[in-house]
Amino acid sequence: MTIFDKSKRGRRAFTIPERDVPEYPLSERFSRRTPLKLPEVSEPDVVRHYTELARKNYAVDVGIYPLGSCTMKYNPKLNERTANLPGFRNVHPLQPEETLQGCLQLMYELKAMLCEITGMDDMTLQPAAGAHGELTGMLIVKKFFDDRKDTKRKKVLVPDSAHGTNPASASMVGFEVVEIKSKNGMVDVEDLRKHLDDEVAAVMLTNPNTLGLFERDILKIAELTHNCGALLYYDGANLNAIMGKVKPGDMGFDIVHLNLHKTFSTPHGMGGPGSGPVGVKRHLVDFLPFPNVEKEGNLYRLTVPKKTIGRVRSFFGNFPVLVKAYSYILMMGRDGLEKVSEMAVLNANYLKKKISRFLKVPYDGFCMHEFVASAEEVFKKTGVRTLDIAKRILDYGVHPPTVYFPLIVPEALMIEPTETESKETLDRYAEILEKVIKEAFENPDVLKNAPHRTPVRRVNEVLASRKPVFRWRGKYEAGDRNQQGT
């Protein structure tokens, strides 16, 4: 039931104070001709409605949220208070630069810290998400080669284990995407070598990759890429594994995008809010989006790079997210960020060892911050799919891992526990998953019809994709909901 369904005419949650200024009639042309369609509810109705929704929801503040490649770590509440300081909360982006010096200083110093962490020379903070950062990076790649009149470079090479946004971002800029095979979970260097030629603009990589494995041949990959005149692009989705240990810039990457909402602990989920800064080496600095923040003497200024790709976001990006990330980095410090990566890798390896007793883990040895298990054998013997396992996990009050990704692992479960989970939490999660796998063999129908205890049972995903309901349409019967759309 929506808040609109609880509306009763004349019911109010507030009283408007008496007017203390003269009445001024509003011109008819500015007046609404129809009543504003807002719910009429009391304050208890509002509080109870949203409290009920919160109780039905799941978040990292409720329990472990081990979505692979999402880094759903606990977010310190101090960062929220920092972002809510009046000096940050009450500014307007159209104020004169002279009155925004505190905000500009924060952005300038955040850029410097992120450049130090990644080994880049400059950075834009404008992109609003990881995929937005990828798009920005690909626009920089295109502008770089266009500026050099090297117009035949139309290809971008992407591993078969890459995030789906990698080929999507390259395609949006007009590049042809070529898939590179994996060998033992890592880039097949020989296959890469075959595809590198003077038509390749960039190679996009994640390191550690989406299997949680560190690309040991990264220096060779960088050498081959640069020898053919192409750029090496770093998808920073998995930076949480290597902070303080190795810098993407030292591996040979020319462009980096980060996810502040993942690695640097700003709350995210359900589409935002996010931030996807893009860092570049010196030869690409002139192509960054504008405005860029620079320091001139004692003042901070908004500047336009010489060969800029233009704006990619209004104003300064998602500024409150930048404040939270800045607060997090200062709070953790250099040693703290290194400890974050150490604990993320330790937790992933601990959980991997426990889960490997009852699920196949395709790639042996140590993983980095995440790992991928496969329920292929479970499916062959019981008919229970990874999706069924994920749905059943919900009945135990915890969130399932990412499923069916990366695509090169059949019936994949991609698990990233992050550094903020305790040993006890990891033990409980492994016990739950083991119990679910045991149920798959003893009573597979329990899993095939799961979840059984959640407010919303298994949805009809085919119908949801063919007749989606994107927004509220007014009061209508439950039986008519699937007929509503946008």
UniProtKB/Swiss-Prot annotation:
The entry's keywords: Oxidoreductase, Pyridoxal phosphate
Domain of life: Bacteria
One MF annotation (Gene Ontology) recorded for this entry: pyridoxal phosphate binding
GO cellular component: cytosol; glycine cleavage complex
Signal peptide: none
Catalyzed reactions: N(6)-[(R)-lipoyl]-L-lysyl-[glycine-cleavage complex H protein] + glycine + H(+) = N(6)-[(R)-S(8)-aminomethyldihydrolipoyl]-L-lysyl-[glycine-cleavage complex H protein] + CO2
The enzyme's E.C. designation: 1.4.4.2
Family recorded in the similarity comment: Belongs to the GcvP family. C-terminal subunit subfamily.
The protein, known as: Probable glycine dehydrogenase (decarboxylating) subunit 2
Cofactor(s), names only, from the UniProt record: pyridoxal 5'-phosphate
A Pfam family: GcvP2_C
Protein role: The glycine cleavage system catalyzes the degradation of glycine. The P protein binds the alpha-amino group of glycine through its pyridoxal phosphate cofactor; CO(2) is released and the remaining methylamine moiety is then transferred to the lipoamide cofactor of the H protein.
PANTHER family on file: GLYCINE DEHYDROGENASE (DECARBOXYLATING), MITOCHONDRIAL, GLYCINE DEHYDROGENASE, DECARBOXYLATING
InterPro entries, sorted: GcvPB, GDC-P_C, GDC-P_N, GDC_P, PyrdxlP-dep_Trfase, PyrdxlP-dep_Trfase_major, PyrdxlP-dep_Trfase_small
Modified residues (N6-(pyridoxal phosphate)lysine): K262
Organism of this sequence: Thermotoga neapolitana (strain ATCC 49049 / DSM 4359 / NBRC 107923 / NS-E)
NCBIfam families noted in UniProt: PRK04366.1 (NF003346)
